[in-house]
Amino acid sequence: MLLVIDVGNTNTVLGVFNGNTLIQDWRIRTIRESTVDEFNLLAKALFVDKKIDLSTIKRTVISSVVPPINSILDTFCTRYLNQKPLWIDPASVKNLMPICYSNPAEVGADRIVNAVAAFERYKTSMIIIDFGTATTFDAISAKGEYLGGAITPGVMISAEALFQRASKLPRVEIFRRPQNVIGKNTIDSIKSGIIYGNGALVDGMVKRMSKEMGTTPKVIATGGLAVLIADASETIEIVDNALTLEGLRIIADQPVFSEGQR
């Protein structure tokens, strides 16, 4: 079986594939101060809970935007899984997708993985929006080229800044959009601004990016808050929260990688 790991600034997502089927996934906090042994204990507990034997993991592929975690995961794989993981970066996927960036090495591994997965699934021009610690917009051409994108502060980062800097505003939990855009109390007004405001941000960015692309791209959202913001957006067509994990599987199954890891 294949273990895929996507390390983000806030959360780390792990998934186990049996062939092309994702049989289990977990979302845990990214803890930069964690040790190899601590990560091993956590991983073992997760696997035992789902009755998955670590010894059945024959290959591991990782994307990470948190360098301090990389050595921990690398050692975990070699010490406890008896294998070297495949690390994803722009150079490792250059044969799968041309990256039209002035410096391809600057593109986050997660963004490239999303792009590879989305193009493999939909085979058309598209804009991928990933709602993570940052909200990223990535444009893919109909030829499967990574054209570039945009980065904005994430939904929760923006909300946290508001709560910290505006002392009279209460901290609110954001689980569902309010019924009305015009809030009738402070809490609903904050929820409206955060949720509908981010929905409008998405729609505005999609409109501008589509104009530059000269196409009508398919708009795909992923990430922890994708469902919530998609409900407030007029342009998001598909929510695919397994996109990054699926992209890691697709890359790992390319002959140049899979043969080297067997």
UniProtKB/Swiss-Prot annotation:
Residues involved in K(+) binding: 130
Keywords: ATP-binding, Coenzyme A biosynthesis, Cytoplasm, Kinase, Metal-binding, Nucleotide-binding, Potassium, Transferase
Sequence positions that bind substrate: 101, 108-111, 186
Cofactor dependence: NH4(+); K(+)
Binding note for cofactor: A monovalent cation. Ammonium or potassium.
Subcellular localization: Cytoplasm
Main location: cytoplasm
EC number(s) on file: 2.7.1.33
Binding site for ATP: 6-13, 133
Entry GO CC: cytoplasm
Catalytic residues (UniProt): 110 (proton acceptor)
NCBIfam families on file: baf, PRK13318.1-6, PRK13321.1
Family: Belongs to the type III pantothenate kinase family.
Oligomer and partners: Homodimer.
Protein name: Type III pantothenate kinase
Species: Desulforapulum autotrophicum (strain ATCC 43914 / DSM 3382 / VKM B-1955 / HRM2)
